[in-house]
């Protein structure tokens, strides 16, 4: 074997070692997140996929502003899939119909009873459908208006008057509603608020910078409340 061929082999070996090292580092780094969150994919014809840039922007804001370590890539999760138990926070949004079948009702209820948290964001038009479906899960519970001193409004950011108003639709006030099971807030529902629209890229809805920041700060509070697990 010539010296030249030996040098070539050594060069290729160094390249392979370098690439393997990079692969191992990348694999380790990609798994070095504290949390991953999910977007709930439901049946019924409603646009569960509305606001496609919202969660990514919220994650970026939270990691930057409140020191979370959330994986920047969120997952789309079907209601009846047991993988839902891997996510401390699940987001549900849309404008239209939502339908949960018996298996999905059971799975989502078990998820919430096991410590999971569901955040519903009314993207205008969702309300009559989601209320009916949540009654399948907790027939004994009604959504209640959370008081302004609830911890969800007072994490890093204080919202002394409750939810900010991001979009105006029916001249109704924005409401922060909750389902409380055995003393724990298992579901937060922002109604007539459009938080998710406020999380979207600035050029999507042309919201003011002030409105977008308020929406992101409230979203950060919701995630902080979810992760810290404060009692009501």
Give the ranges of each region predicted by the language model.
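Positively charged n-region of N-terminal signal peptides that target proteins for export
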Residues: 9-16
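Bacterial N-terminal signal peptides
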Residues: 16-26
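Aromatic-Pro/Gly-enriched surface loop or interdomain linker
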Residues: 30-89, 93-96, 194-195, 199-232
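Loop/turn elements at helix/coil->beta-strand transitions in domains of secreted/extracellular proteins
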Residues: 33-35, 85-90, 113-117, 141, ...
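An acidic, glycine-rich "communication" segment
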Residues: 35-36, 41-45, 53-54, 127-203, ...
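Short alpha-beta junction capping motif
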Residues: 37, 89-128
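Surface-exposed patches in mature extracellular/periplasmic domains of secreted proteins
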Residues: 69-77, 120-123, 141-147, 232
């Amino acid at each position: 074997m010539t010296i030249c061929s030996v040098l070539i082999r050594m060069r290729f070996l160094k390249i392979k070692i370098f690439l393997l090292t990079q692969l191992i580092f990348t694999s380790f780094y990609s798994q070095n997140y504290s949390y991953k969150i999910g977007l709930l994919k439901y049946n019924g014809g409603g646009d569960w996929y509305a606001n496609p840039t919202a969660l990514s922007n919220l994650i970026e804001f939270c990691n930057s502003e409140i020191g979370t370590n959330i994986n920047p890539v969120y997952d789309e999760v079907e209601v009846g899939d047991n993988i839902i138990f891997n996510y401390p926070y699940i987001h549900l949004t849309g404008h239209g119909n939502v339908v949960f079948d018996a298996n999905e009702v059971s799975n989502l209820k078990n998820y919430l009873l096991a410590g999971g948290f569901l955040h519903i964001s009314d993207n205008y038009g969702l309300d009559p459908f989601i209320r009916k479906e949540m009654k399948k899960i907790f027939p004994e519970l009604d959504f209640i208006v959370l008081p302004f001193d609830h911890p969800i409004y007072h994490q890093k950011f204080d919202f002394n008057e409750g939810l900010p108003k991001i979009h105006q639709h029916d001249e109704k006030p924005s409401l922060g509603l909750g389902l409380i099971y055995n003393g724990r807030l298992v579901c937060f529902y922002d109604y007539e608020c459009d938080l998710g629209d406020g999380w979207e890229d600035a050029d999507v809805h042309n919201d003011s910078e002030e409105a977008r920041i308020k929406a992101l700060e409230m979203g950060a509070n919701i995630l902080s409340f979810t992760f810290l697990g404060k009692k009501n």
